[in-house]
């Protein structure tokens, strides 16, 4: 048997982290078993489905590297198939036409609620022969009257549901459009899906779908339902918890494999291992180690993993990902150091690529914004003479290398009997505008000689103006 899994999102909004984890687990299971992973777009909600959401799903999957072997298939392109199967079920007596009005169904529901009963269809049209006479009707499934629906969920174990708890669900609405529970069964059957891995909000649908599979004499897939992901406050993950769309994590500067590594550990474990390459995930993944407990999304843990990969990945690969952030900021990368060199000095100092871009823009701009507190603290008249001497020493350098730059700084600090920081910090503020940067020698080396000298001269003018104002 070839394992075939699927990811079947609805294009009614963004691709959220819960959906991404479902896609990841389905993808990993297929890859682990040398199977196939199918992408299906469940776009039957015509009012809420948008092409923008479809594109966001495709872009998110591509960014994460979750390549699919087949698809994307679209449910809206399969309506003829759903109608064909519905007519087959009608012909075999496994479905029936129902002409109950909305008013009757609403009255039935209110009466059942008043009697503290579970709202369900009462089978009013079940045994009537209703021809297609032009009166609007829906097509309902003739659910078995008795018996138990039993299945083994790979996460939750054995589940048993009495058929008396299930009513005759609608397969096709009066406008001819299929319902979710009907379309998904036909799709999984036609696409030969062997394992359905999805959120546990679908557990209640599973007994109904199993009855449909059996009515069609179709093989019933294996089911695995994944627990929900919550925010750290124990509530359902939403916008108030921060980013929820997968592409928002790209904007936040999270590396795609860092996000995958984080998500795979939300509800799945392999011993005590925390760090997984994508290949290690594929090699190790199974469903028996998926937890039934809900998971909490922790941004600190995600950023810890992200920083790990910023430091351990090749500088070239991190630089390639970082380039997108500079482009979004409108920064001309031709005006500064090679991004690989920037990554070498900044990767350990930042939790994300977005932060790395934000704190490194002074390397690529002609002008800088000064932090006024840093200027007030470090660009004081007392450092005017040492910085003037340092300016001349740096200007005279033939080789603009970090070791030569550091020699100049050391010599001037000795000449004026100053602690090294008393020279380095004013110099840092002079060339970056703030009191934080990589080591001062590397900062100047990456800035280049012309930019460093020009900014030091501008800072000296600031200090002179401040001294004359005293």
Curated annotation (Swiss-Prot):
**Any idea which positions bind ATP?**
239
| Locations listed in the record | Cytoplasm
GO-annotated cellular components: cytosol
Query: What does the record give as EC number?
Result: 6.1.1.17
InterPro entries registered for this protein in UniProt: aa-tRNA-synth_I_cd-bd, aa-tRNA-synth_I_codon-bd_sub2, aa-tRNA-synth_I_CS, aa_tRNA-synth_I_cd-bd_sf, Glu-tRNA-ligase_bac/mito, Glu/Gln-tRNA-synth, Glu/Gln-tRNA-synth_Ib_cat-dom, GluQ/Sye
One GO term in the molecular function aspect is: glutamate-tRNA ligase activity
Q: Pfam families from the xrefs?
A: Anticodon_2 (PF19269), tRNA-synt_1c (PF00749)
- Coiled-coil region(s) at which residues? none
Q: Which residues form the signal peptide?
A: none
Record HAMAP family: Glu_tRNA_synth_type1
- Please report which protein family the annotation says this sequence is part of: Belongs to the class-I aminoacyl-tRNA synthetase family. Glutamate--tRNA ligase type 1 subfamily.
What is the recorded name of this protein?
Glutamate--tRNA ligase
Species the sequence originates in: Legionella pneumophila (strain Paris)
